[in-house]
């Protein structure tokens, strides 16, 4: 039985709607990832030409590379005083620590929240607070396991100090790891950033440290999963103790 015009229009509308829904669920790739994804794709074509099973392995690696450099949109809470996660990953450490000398934040302990990013996490980094970037300092170093405490002093790293309007200075350090060999920063000294704004990325596994003024109320715990630009790490304005429990 022939399909009438109205039915065809209805089918076409459903297909367009479905396509929009699929596009909305697929994160775009960050431009910094194009050379890597393209390289993996080219290698995959060559592997298929050599031996098809190798080509399928290359296909999986290309998909993984595209996922690694995904650049999803995030919904960031913007209330004054909130500190959001700068990275997707897992909170590996929360402790009072004297900040590295390059931050120039003094010799008294600050609250350090460390987030470890595996090779399966999105590696686009976002500003934890709104403010003005006072300085950016790069330090070459080793590539030991980023989960180790000494990685913050020994590993290659890039440090940012952000001056907030009402809550003092906040330090953010991108730390390279065993696999990560390239830290990328998109911002510069004197630039103003918003909470959750993209400021850099680290290629292939790493860690981010956030240094907050002593006494800042931390709202997360070690082992907790974070989403960059969305998970609230701390609240400068809160003074009534913990707001979560483990279960």
From Swiss-Prot:
- UniProt topology in membrane: Peripheral membrane protein
Q: What is its main location?
A: membrane
Q: What about PTM?
A: Is synthesized initially as an inactive proenzyme. Formation of the active enzyme involves a self-maturation process in which the active site pyruvoyl group is generated from an internal serine residue via an autocatalytic post-translational modification. Two non-identical subunits are generated from the proenzyme in this reaction, and the pyruvate is formed at the N-terminus of the alpha chain, which is derived from the carboxyl end of the proenzyme.
One GO term in the molecular function aspect is:
phosphatidylserine decarboxylase activity
Tell me which InterPro entries the record gives: PS_Dcarbxylase, PSD-A
Q: Name one GO cellular component term.
A: plasma membrane
Protein location:
Cell membrane
Q: Which residues form a coiled coil?
A: none
Instruction: Give the modified residues of type Pyruvic acid (Ser).
Output: 206
- Which Enzyme Commission numbers does its entry carry? 4.1.1.65
Which catalytic reaction applies to this protein?
Answer: a 1,2-diacyl-sn-glycero-3-phospho-L-serine + H(+) = a 1,2-diacyl-sn-glycero-3-phosphoethanolamine + CO2
Instruction: State the active site.
Output: 206
How is the cofactor bound here? Binds 1 pyruvoyl group covalently per subunit.
GO terms classed as biological process: phosphatidylethanolamine biosynthetic process
Which keywords does this Swiss-Prot/TrEMBL entry list? Cell membrane, Decarboxylase, Lipid biosynthesis, Lipid metabolism, Lyase, Membrane, Phospholipid biosynthesis, Phospholipid metabolism, Pyruvate, Zymogen
Q: Which domain of life is it from?
A: Bacteria
Name the cofactor(s): pyruvate
Q: Which Pfam families match?
A: PS_Dcarbxylase
* Pathway the protein contributes to: Phospholipid metabolism; phosphatidylethanolamine biosynthesis; phosphatidylethanolamine from CDP-diacylglycerol: step 2/2
Marked site (Cleavage (non-hydrolytic)) residue numbers:
205-206
Q: How does it assemble?
A: Heterodimer of a large membrane-associated beta subunit and a small pyruvoyl-containing alpha subunit.
Q: Which family does it belong to?
A: Belongs to the phosphatidylserine decarboxylase family. PSD-A subfamily.
- Report the function annotation for this chain: Catalyzes the formation of phosphatidylethanolamine (PtdEtn) from phosphatidylserine (PtdSer).
Q: What's the protein called, per UniProt?
A: Phosphatidylserine decarboxylase proenzyme
Write down the species: Nitrobacter winogradskyi (strain ATCC 25391 / DSM 10237 / CIP 104748 / NCIMB 11846 / Nb-255)
What's the encoding gene here?
A: psd
């Amino acid at each position: 039985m022939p399909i009438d015009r109205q039915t065809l229009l209805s089918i076409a509308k459903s297909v367009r709607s479905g396509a929009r829904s699929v596009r909305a669920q697929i994160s775009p790739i960050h431009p910094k990832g194009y050379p890597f994804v393209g390289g993996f794709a080219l290698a995959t074509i060559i592997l298929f030409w050599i031996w098809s099973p190798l080509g399928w392995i290359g296909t999986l690696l290309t998909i993984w590379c595209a996922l690694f450099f995904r650049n999803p949109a995030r919904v960031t809470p913007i209330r004054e005083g909130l500190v959001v996660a700068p990275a997707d990953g897992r909170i590996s450490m929360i402790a009072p620590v004297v900040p590295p000398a390059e931050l120039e934040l003094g010799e008294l302990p600050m609250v350090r929240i460390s987030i470890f990013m595996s090779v399966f996490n999105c590696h686009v980094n976002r500003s934890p607070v709104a403010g003005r970037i006072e300085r950016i300092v790069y330090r070459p170093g080793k590539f030991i396991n980023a989960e180790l405490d000494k990685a913050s002093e020994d590993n290659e790293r890039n440090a940012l100090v952000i001056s907030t309007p009402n809550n003092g200075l906040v330090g953010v350090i991108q730390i390279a790891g065993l696999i990560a060999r390239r830290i990328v920063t998109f911002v510069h000294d004197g630039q103003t950033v918003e909470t959750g704004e993209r400021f850099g990325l680290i290629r292939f596994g790493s860690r981010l440290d956030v240094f907050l003024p002593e006494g800042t109320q931390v709202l997360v715990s070690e082992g907790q999963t974070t989403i960059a630009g969305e998970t609230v790490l701390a609240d400068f304005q809160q003074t009534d103790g913990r707001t979560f429990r483990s279960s």
